[in-house]
């Protein structure tokens, strides 16, 4: 299993919209579901900083994730651009492989 971990600071007033777009049934998850190697997305909100969120995107493997990004680069970038208005900051926290 592979995990891509992202952190976001969401603009005040955009929390509900952000949660819909980035949640487990949101636009990103629906986009990823086009690939059979995508597993799930989890969205977590910081208990102490209510405008801070992390997303966990789980895939079968790092190769599957990278292949999806390469094959869908334009659509990925277009979706990412459409979400920019909701966030103050987006940071890739890491790419993690499961240790068995």
Put a short name on every predicted segment:
Residues 7, 93-95:
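Short amphipathic
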Residues 13-19, 64-66:
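Short, conserved charged micro-motifs
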């Amino acid at each position: 299993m592979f995990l891509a971990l992202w952190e976001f600071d969401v603009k005040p007033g955009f929390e509900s919209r952000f949660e819909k777009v980035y949640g487990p049934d949101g636009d990103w998850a629906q986009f990823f579901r086009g690939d059979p190697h995508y597993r799930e997305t989890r969205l977590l909100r910081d208990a102490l900083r209510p405008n801070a969120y992390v997303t966990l995107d789980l895939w079968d493997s790092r190769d599957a994730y990278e292949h999806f990004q390469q094959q869908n680069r334009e659509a990925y970038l277009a979706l990412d651009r459409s979400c920019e208005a909701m966030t103050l900051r987006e940071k890739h926290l890491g790419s993690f492989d499961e240790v068995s």
